Amino acid sequence: MHQVFYQKYRPINFKQTLGQESIRKILVNAINRDKLPNGYIFSGERGTGKTTFAKIIAKAINCLNWDQIDVCNSCDVCKSINTNSAIDIVEIDAASKNGINDIRELVENVFNHPFTFKKKVYILDEAHMLTTQSWGGLLKTLEESPPYVLFIFTTTEFNKIPLTILSRCQSFFFKKITSDLILERLNDIAKKEKIKIEKDALIKIADLSQGSLRDGLSLLDQISNFSDSEKISITDVEKTFNIVDRNAKFTFIKAVLSGDIKEAFNLLDDFESNGLNFTYFLRELFALTVNLYAYAKLKNINVLDSTEKTMIETLNFEKQHYAFLIKAIEENTNFGLSQLTLIDRLKAIVISYNEFFNQKPLTISSPSNEKSLHLETEYLEKKKIKKSNHKQDQKHFSLFEKSFIDKSEKTPKNDEVTNNKFLDTSKLNLANIALAINAFNDNKWINHFQNLLSVFQTKFNDKDKQNNLSYFNNFIDKYSARDIVKATKIVKASSFGIVILFEDQKIAMRLWKEAIEEGNVQATIFQIFNQNLFLASFSEHQYKTTITEETKNQKYQTEVLNLTQLENLAKPFLKEKKRSLSQKMVDKYFKGLFEEK
C-alpha cells in the first residue's frame, strides 16, 4: 500500500529536521541540562515542523540511548513512539476534542505515573481550537503539573492562546522553511523514489509550497504520477496546478503598466478559463516586479535569470515601464506596501474600464487610433452636456444642507453601510465630510499631498504644448483635472480625504457636486495623489466663514461618520449599470483581489 510522502519522509530525529536550528539547539540543551518547563507552545505556519519536533522531544527525554545530541530510533522507546503505540505519549487533536469533558478526562490521568517511560508527554495539536472553558480547566493542572509530565501545544494561531497559558509555558515560533532547503529535500526524495523530473519543475514545486515542507512533499507526490517514461517538466507542473507561465505574466505586467485595458482583460479571461490560482498569481507577479525593479535600478542584466532576460528582450520593455516600477516600490517603506501600490494600479485600470465598458474599442491609451479618438470625443461630448445641465441647476445647490440628527429615525448599522456595493452619498454634505477629515487631520499628510499637488500643477502648466497635451491626455476625467489644477492649497488632510481651497467658488462647488453624484473626481484624485481620497472643496471665503468658525465654536451639529464609512467614501464609485457577462467576469476577477476579506 502506498504511503504518502509527507508521512513516509517525516523527520524522526533532530538531524533530519529543516530550518529550525536555533529552536533545535535550545531544546537539546534543555534536555541535557534537565531544565524542561511544564509546557511548550510551538507556533508557526503549517508544515514547518511543530508536531514533528514535539514527537522528537518525546523520544529524546525517554530515549534509552540518548547521546546528548540525538535520539537513537533503535531502542524500544523510540520504536514505540515511531509506530504511535506508546501509551505514555498522548497526542490529542484539539480541533475535534476541545470540550471541557475531554479536558477533564485528560486532567484526571495527568497525575497517574507513566507506565513504562520516564516522562508522560501530552501533545495538543491545533491548541487554539480549545474553548475558554477547556483552557480554564487546564490552567491549574498546567501550573502544578507533576515533574514526570510535559505539555506541548502546537498552533497556527498564536494570538488565540490565552495570556494565562502563555505566561506558564515557553513559546517557540517556527519560521517558514526556505525554498532552497525544501528544494534540497525534494531532490533527495525524487532520487529515492526514482521520479524523473527536471530541476526547474522541482524549483517551481518548492516555490509553490510557500515555506511548508509538508505541502511540498504532497505536491511532489501528486505530480509523480504525471508520467512514467518522460521527464516531468515545469510546464507539466504549471498545467497540473493551474499556474500561469512566466511568459504570460510578463505580458500581463506590460499590459498593466501600459494601460492596455483590452489586452489585460483578455489575458485574465484566458487565466480564468484555465483555472488560475489568483493568490499564487499575485505573489508571482510581485516577485517579477521586484526583479525588474532591481534591473532598472542597477542597470545590470545579471540580476535577472535567463528566462527573465529573454522575456524583456522579446516584449521590449520601455523606460516608462521601469519608471513606474521604481516609483511604486520607492514611494513605500517596504515591499509589502509596494505590493498595494501595484494593486492600486490595477484598480485604476478597473475604473477606466468601467468608464467605457459599454463602448468599443476598450483601448484608450493610443491617441493614434481613430476609433479610440472617436470614443474619447463621444465621452467628452457627454461631459459637456452634463456641464451645461449643471450650470442651470447650480443656483439650487446648497453648500450646507441641514444635517441635524433626527433621533426618531434609525441610523443604518455599520455593516449595512460597508456592504453597499455602490455607496449612497446623497445624504452627505460638504461640512460633515470636512469636519470628519479634520478629526483625523495630520500635518504629515498635508505636506505630502501639497507636494504632489504642486508637482501636478507644474506638469499641467508646462509651457511646452506637446508635453502639456501628453500629460493632460493621461487623465480619465479631464474636466475635473482642469478644475483641480486651479487649487490654492490643502488645509486639512488624512489618509482618506483632503480639504482643498479654491479662489473661485464655482469651481469648488462643481468639484464637490461631481464627487458626490458621479464619482469621477475620485479617479482624478487617485491619478494625482496615488491614493484613494475623498475631496472636500471650498472657496477660501466659504472655508473661513463657515468651517473655521463652526469648528471653533462647536455650533455645527452633524451626523458622525465612522472610520469605515469614511474610508469607503475615498474609494472611486460608479452608478449602477446593467452588466454583461464579461463585466460580471471582471467583477469576479477583482472582487477577491481588491476587497478586504
From Swiss-Prot:
Binding site for ATP: G44, E45, R46, G47, T48, G49, K50, T51
Keywords assigned: ATP-binding, DNA replication, DNA-directed DNA polymerase, Metal-binding, Nucleotide-binding, Nucleotidyltransferase, Transferase, Zinc
UniProt xrefs under Pfam families: DNA_pol3_delta2 (PF13177), DNAX_ATPase_lid (PF22608)
EC number: 2.7.7.7
Domain of life: Bacteria
Binding residue positions for Zn(2+): C63, C72, C75, C78
Disruption phenotype: Probably essential, it was not disrupted in a global transposon mutagenesis study.
Cellular component annotations (GO), alphabetically ordered: DNA polymerase III complex
Gene Ontology molecular function, alphabetical: ATP binding; ATP hydrolysis activity; DNA binding; DNA-directed DNA polymerase activity; metal ion binding
Subunit (UniProt): DNA polymerase III contains a core (composed of alpha, epsilon and theta chains) that associates with a tau subunit. This core dimerizes to form the POLIII' complex. PolIII' associates with the gamma complex (composed of gamma, delta, delta', psi and chi chains) and with the beta chain to form the complete DNA polymerase III complex.
Similarity remark: Belongs to the DnaX/STICHEL family.
Biological function: DNA polymerase III is a complex, multichain enzyme responsible for most of the replicative synthesis in bacteria. This DNA polymerase also exhibits 3' to 5' exonuclease activity.
Stated name of the protein: DNA polymerase III subunit gamma/tau
Species of origin: Mycoplasma genitalium (strain ATCC 33530 / DSM 19775 / NCTC 10195 / G37)
Origin organism lineage: Bacteria, Bacillati, Mycoplasmatota, Mycoplasmoidales, Mycoplasmoidaceae
Gene name in the database record: dnaX
